């Protein structure tokens, strides 16, 4: 047994770090070291068993006599699950190491230094304001990084987030008030997101952030705090505060009023800062090509960029599979790509979950189309039976005070069709605004005549084969919907004990999570003998027909053949003996209610017991005596309990952990009721679907879902497909009445008296044949029920092509290539499509299934209208004010009580509304978030960061077009001309790598890999390096070099925009249309231009990459030195000291690039062994090259020495304070261990800082 020793102190953040890591180990594939989950011990380990002096917490003992590991960093890394920190050597793994190191060496000391004074642990002479300043300095890099990232190293919490969050736990609890949290808004958002993850919450509970009011109890070790201040000191501090207040007031006044003589800001400058004011105003009829002949606007504006392109794409037919070929049947060596959209429900508008699905699917579709494949992405909408009927009923009640029964079936269905027309158009509008390259001429609705015919055909065929059958069984019944629902439409709410839940239709909450015991008197017993049973649903005792005990239970052997008396009914209940009873639970006796419990139903079948149903479809009691008759089920619960008490049969009530089944549509408590329904036999179809995955005919990605697939298929039950609704496909089955005395009348559960048909006439002919009578003796009554929505959705891959008719589309596009959807509907939809496709067409409906993660909000919460975190993607695209978000709630179907709760959620998450981000930024951001298998905690602020990326693309292209010049003519091909410079070769090499990573990422559905490769190329390589290096070349006298650079630059723009196009179709089209073409017959649009492939971009150049990597290493070192010495406005000379001639030659080759990138003066390579000039600061660029930056003449040595001496004195004082603090009486015994460790780290840092200061002092002394 492994043991994790931790501190019980609630603020012991090193121990908390270990405990959270252990939680992640439990939730994942186990601890990274491969051992068992450790036992937690809230005390130090015995000193006799540890190899280090106690107490050193946290500590992990890996089994008796095993390895000991201590200290938060080591223990957390050992407990953290393998694979969640990125593969070794990967970018993610490097980022994890970087931020863990930063948390331990920078954040922890700064956090402790700022927090300890607030806890009464300030040392002598310690300045709290300076400590807060140090914390702010440590938070700044974190704030900048988190501006564009949800987590520190990837799309889910890693060890880096764990280290940083626990380091900042004390400041967020005790120091950082609301105003400070606004300054570090990104850090605060990230901190809140992390601590709301289940693994963090399990350890930390609800983290309450510091409100600004503090009441802190003196902590142990308080004897080392500073003595009380003298009157003189207090007076001095009061003066300081007074000066500070005056200064702040002066600043506030200056901000509100311009200084004398100062001009007010010009309106046009204000407009320039506002990114949303630039619009496209040229008269362009819908469907005509946008005019891009004018000057590019100064900055990127989504409104300007996205105007006019989509109607033109649609009108030109770019999204149709026929584009560029005589017909869809024409052979294409590139192949066919077909995918159907998961048809969104017509229950309302699309949300960000739909936007994620759309972004992934459209990027894949555009990639396949640009690769030259015959590509079809088929649109459609789903009628969503239950969901739509519920929404429309709510709307009718809210607006007109009517329910559907008052309106009547036909009138109600007309209202639903109106709703569908309105919402369907809205959904298609949203999809178009998202840039979806769907073939709208093939759009369909699941209740269109073509698709309805497929549904009828499928039902009739399956019914004729006996796969669909009618049976009376227990079903999941929603009394609110007045309909049966399937198993996977039932949510399970776990209760630990007594809980009051809101139930639709009841004013007061209903009690659950209790076990009620009561007695049945044994019939004919002289001793007043009784049998005590217990139940969580006491109202169902009115439907009891027996009491069951175990055959081997000695307590009841004497009761064989006997009965008990029901206290409220004129019937006796036999005592039956059945193996299903657990003798150890309760009294070992169980009440049997076959009509309202699945286990009881099976017992009843074995013992031939009557099933007495005591509830109608609305949950009111029937078949019971007064006073219970007609009572709603949960009112009856109270009445039965009172009656039992009155008769002296009540025996007790106690808390009982249980699971309450809830309808996921109505939130009603589901009742098991006996009802005749239509079922699909799933056994054989499930075996076939499971075998298809086993054989590899069907791939499910991520592969982790395959195990779940097999488990579900192996344990599948028959599927109830009838719903007691009005909206949906009416079941094409008819109850038969035969007007012939020789044929007895039938009953509903008897399947022989039901017939299916494509038409009523066909059904009548079949019925006549079945009963051997003429058709005129047959009367038919069509079933009032409709089919489960998932039945028609399961036919979608071939119903859209008109199956069973053999159309051209069906022969070309079925089976499809890919099914892409969220993992939450793997069994709702994907499994049904596979089973029905194999059964009806003898083909798999698609070859691959890719399941993306589920979108949650920035705090990890499920999207819910009542939480106010359901976001319309158009609000992210266009932006919306907080009031606008509130107004949407008022126009929704939310109950008034939920509206205020939702408003609070919106105020907390979007205090300033949602900024305009644009479609491209939203799409790119969603794909960048998509990590296989993990849910996505979406922070809208991060999407804004990708809008800034769009602006970078815009400015880079604008600069590049100026550099190319008006008369520029690109080469017919992108082949290098042979005269490329080193940096030309380098950027081509990096571009080739981006092309490789993009194609491999698309093939593997690794969207973050693709977005990272493209983002890095454009931002860090093209903009930050190549364009900067290009400026002196384009302005120079070497025309050959300039021409060669222009061709390379054009290639970068051409290939780079094509790479980005699947993710960012609007901005890339806008920029691509402004580029000159290589050939006159080039494609009209970027969306049908060939996607770059490695064979086209075979420019990998390791030699150039090594050279530029050295240049960039030198540049980073020079920039760091310039920052250290505040040389922001000067260009200091730089001397490179190399270890060998090869490095020297390489450094010489890149010296001009270093000069440009580092803003240096002369960049010279020193001869081997030659000394550097006097007065240089030194830094290391690599193990083969050091930098000497000339400071002589650029800085005042005497002044710098003065500053360094002051800095040295302060560092010495700080070191002395820490040493005195650690030597103080009671320090090791009373000060928390984590504080001791923080002090030790801070002392090491201070001593290292002193050594650096001494080196700098020595340097400047030589310059005097």
From Swiss-Prot:
PANTHER family with a match to the protein in the record: VALINE--TRNA LIGASE (PTHR11946:SF109), VALYL-TRNA SYNTHETASES (PTHR11946)
CDD domains per the UniProt record, alphabetical: Anticodon_Ia_Val, UDM1_RNF168_RNF169-like, ValRS_core
How its function is modulated: the record gives: Can be regulated by protein kinase C-dependent phosphorylation.
Q: List residues binding ATP.
A: 865
Reactions listed under catalytic activity: tRNA(Val) + L-valine + ATP = L-valyl-tRNA(Val) + AMP + diphosphate
Which species does this protein come from? Rattus norvegicus
Q: Which Pfam families match?
A: Anticodon_1, GST_C, tRNA-synt_1
**Could you tell me where the Polar residues compositional bias lies?**
218-230
Q: What is this protein called?
A: Valine--tRNA ligase
Concerning NCBIfam families, the annotation shows: PRK05729.1, valS
Query: Which protein family is it in?
Result: Belongs to the class-I aminoacyl-tRNA synthetase family.
PTM annotation (Phosphoserine): residues: 437, 527
- The sequence motif named 'HIGH' region is recorded at 344-354
């Amino acid at each position: 047994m492994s043991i994790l020793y931790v501190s019980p102190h609630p603020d012991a953040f090193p121990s908390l770090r270990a405990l959270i890591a252990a939680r992640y180990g439990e939730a994942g594939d186990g601890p990274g070291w491969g051992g068992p989950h450790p036992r937690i011990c809230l005390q130090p380990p015995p000193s006799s068993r540890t190899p280090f002096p106690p107490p050193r917490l946290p500590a992990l003992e890996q089994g008796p006599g095993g390895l000991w590991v201590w200290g938060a960093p080591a223990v957390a890394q050992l407990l953290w699950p393998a694979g969640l920190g990125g593969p070794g050597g990967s970018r993610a793994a490097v980022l994890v190491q970087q931020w863990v190191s930063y948390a331990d060496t920078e954040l922890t000391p700064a956090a402790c230094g700022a927090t300890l004074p607030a806890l009464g642990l300030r040392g002598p002479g310690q300045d709290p304001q300076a400590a807060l300043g140090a914390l702010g300095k440590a938070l700044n890099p974190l704030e900048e990084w988190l501006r564009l990232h949800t987590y520190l190293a990837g799309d889910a919490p890693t060890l880096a987030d764990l280290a940083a969050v626990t380091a900042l736990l004390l400041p967020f609890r005790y120091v950082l008030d609301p105003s400070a949290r606004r300054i570090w808004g990104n850090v605060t958002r990230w901190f809140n997101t992390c601590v709301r993850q289940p693994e963090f919450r399990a350890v930390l509970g609800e983290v309450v952030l510091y409100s600004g009011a503090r009441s802190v109890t003196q902590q142990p070790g308080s004897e080392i705090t500073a003595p009380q201040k003298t009157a003189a000191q207090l007076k001095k501090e009061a003066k300081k505060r007074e000066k500070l207040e005056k200064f702040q007031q002066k600043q506030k006044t200056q901000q509100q009023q311009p200084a004398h003589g100062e001009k007010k800001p010009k309106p046009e400058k204000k407009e320039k800062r506002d990114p949303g004011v630039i619009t496209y105003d040229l008269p362009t009829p819908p469907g005509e090509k946008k005019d891009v002949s004018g000057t590019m606007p100064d900055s990127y504006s989504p409104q300007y960029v996205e105007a006019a392109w989509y109607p033109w794409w649609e009108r030109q037919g770019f999204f149709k599979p026929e584009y560029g070929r005589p017909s869809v049947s024409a052979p294409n060596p590139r192949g066919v790509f077909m995918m159907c959209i998961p048809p969104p429900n017509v229950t309302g508008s699309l949300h960000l979950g739909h936007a994620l699905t759309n972004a992934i699917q459209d990027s894949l579709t555009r990639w396949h189309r640009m690769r030259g494949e015959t590509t079809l992405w088929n649109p459609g909408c789903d009628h969503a039976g239950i969901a739509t009927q519920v929404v429309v009923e709510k709307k009718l009640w809210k607006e007109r005070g009517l329910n559907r029964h008052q309106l009547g079936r036909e009138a109600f269905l007309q209202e639903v069709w109106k709703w569908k027309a309105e919402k369907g158009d809205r959904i298609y509008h949203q999809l178009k605004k998202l840039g979806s390259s769907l073939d709208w001429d093939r759009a369909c609705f699941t209740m269109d005549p073509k698709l309805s015919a497929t549904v009828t055909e499928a039902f009739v065929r399956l019914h004729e084969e006996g796969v669909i059958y009618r049976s009376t069984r227990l079903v999941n019944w929603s009394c609110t919907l007045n309909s049966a629902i399937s198993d996977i439409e039932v949510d399970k709410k776990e209760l630990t004990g007594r809980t009051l839940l809101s139930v639709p239709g009841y004013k007061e909450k209903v009690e659950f999570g209790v076990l009620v015991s009561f007695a049945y008197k044994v019939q004919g017993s002289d001793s007043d003998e009784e049998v005590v049973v217990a139940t969580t649903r006491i109202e169902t005792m009115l439907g009891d027909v027996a009491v069951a005990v175990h055959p081997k239970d000695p307590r009841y052997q004497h009761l064989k053949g006997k009965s008990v008396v029901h206290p409220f009914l004129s019937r006796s209940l036999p005592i039956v003996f059945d193996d299903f009873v657990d003798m150890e639970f309760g009294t070992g006796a169980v009440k049997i209610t076959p009509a309202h419990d699945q286990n009881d139903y099976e017992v009843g079948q074995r013992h031939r017991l009557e099933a007495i149903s005591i509830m109608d479809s609305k949950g009111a009691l029937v078949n019971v005596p007064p006073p219970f008759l007609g009572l709603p089920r949960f009112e009856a619960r109270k009445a039965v309990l009172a009656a039992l008490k009155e008769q002296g049969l009540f025996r007790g009530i106690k808390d009982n952990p249980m699971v309450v089944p809830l309808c996921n549509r109505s939130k009603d408590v589901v009742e098991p009721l006996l009802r005749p329904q239509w079922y699909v036999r799933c056994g054989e179809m499930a075996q076939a679907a499971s075998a298809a995955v086993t054989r590899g005919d069907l791939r499910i990605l991520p592969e982790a879902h395959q195990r779940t697939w097999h488990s579900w298929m192996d344990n599948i039950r028959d599927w109830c497909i009838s719903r007691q609704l009005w909206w949906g496909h009416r079941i094409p089955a008819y109850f038969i009445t035969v007007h012939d005395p020789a044929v007895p009348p039938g009953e509903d559960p008897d399947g022989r008296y039901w017939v299916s048909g494509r038409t009523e006439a066909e059904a009548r002919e079949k019925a006549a044949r079945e009963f051997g009578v003429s058709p005129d003796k047959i009367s038919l009554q069509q079933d009032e029920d409709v089919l489960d929505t998932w039945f028609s959705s399961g036919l979608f891959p071939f119903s859209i092509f008109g199956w069973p008719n053999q159309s051209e589309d069906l022969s070309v596009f079925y089976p499809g290539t890919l099914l892409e959807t969220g993992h939450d509907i793997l069994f709702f939809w994907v499994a049904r499509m596979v089973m029905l496709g194999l059964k009806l067409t003898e083909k798999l409906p698609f070859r691959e299934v890719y399941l993306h993660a589920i979108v949650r909000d920035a705090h990890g919460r499920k999207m819910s209208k009542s939480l106010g975190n359901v976001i319309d993607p158009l609000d992210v695209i266009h932006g919306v004010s907080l009031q606008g978000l509130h107004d949407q709630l008022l126009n929704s179907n939310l109950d008034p009580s939920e509206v205020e709760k939702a408003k609070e959620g919106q105020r907390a998450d979007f205090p300033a509304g949602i900024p305009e981000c644009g479609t491209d930024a939203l799409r790119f951001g969603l794909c960048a978030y998509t990590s296989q298998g993990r849910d996505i905690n979406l922070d809208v602020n991060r999407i804004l960061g990708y809008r800034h990326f769009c602006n970078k693309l815009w400015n880079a292209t604008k600069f590049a077009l100026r550099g190319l010049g008006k008369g520029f003519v690109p080469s017919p091909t992108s082949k290098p001309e042979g005269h490329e410079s080193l940096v030309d070769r380098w950027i081509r090499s990096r571009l080739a790598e981006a092309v490789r990573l993009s194609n491999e990422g698309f093939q593997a559905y690794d969207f973050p890999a693709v977005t990272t490769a493209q983002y890095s190329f454009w931002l860090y390589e093209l903009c930050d390096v190549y364009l900067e290096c290009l400026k002196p070349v384009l302005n120079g006298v070497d025309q050959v070099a300039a021409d060669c650079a222009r061709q390379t630059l054009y290639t970068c723009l051409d290939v780079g925009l094509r790479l980005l196009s699947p993710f960012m179709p609007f901005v890339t089209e806008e920029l691509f249309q402004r580029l000159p073409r290589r050939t006159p017959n080039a494609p009209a649009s970027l969306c049908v231009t060939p996607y770059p492939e490695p064979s086209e971009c075979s420019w990998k150049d390791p030699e150039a990459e090594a050279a530029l990597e050295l240049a960039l290493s030198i540049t980073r070192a020079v920039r760091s030195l310039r920052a250290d010495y505040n040389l922001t406005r000067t260009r200091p000379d730089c001397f490179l000291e190399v270890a060998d001639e090869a490095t020297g030659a390489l450094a010489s080759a890149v010296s001009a690039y270093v000069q440009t990138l580092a803003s240096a003066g002369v960049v010279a390579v020193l001869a081997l062994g030659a000394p550097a000039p006097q007065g240089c600061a030194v830094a290391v660029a690599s193990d083969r090259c050091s930098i000497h930056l000339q400071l002589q003449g650029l800085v005042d040595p005497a002044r710098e020495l003065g500053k360094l001496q002051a800095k040295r004195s302060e560092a010495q004082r700080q070191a002395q304070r820490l040493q005195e603090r650690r030597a103080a009486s009671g320090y090791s015994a009373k000060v928390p261990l984590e504080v001791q460790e923080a002090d030790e780290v801070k002392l090491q840092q201070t001593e290292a800082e002193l050594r650096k200061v001494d080196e700098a002092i020595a340097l400047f002394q030589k310059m005097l």
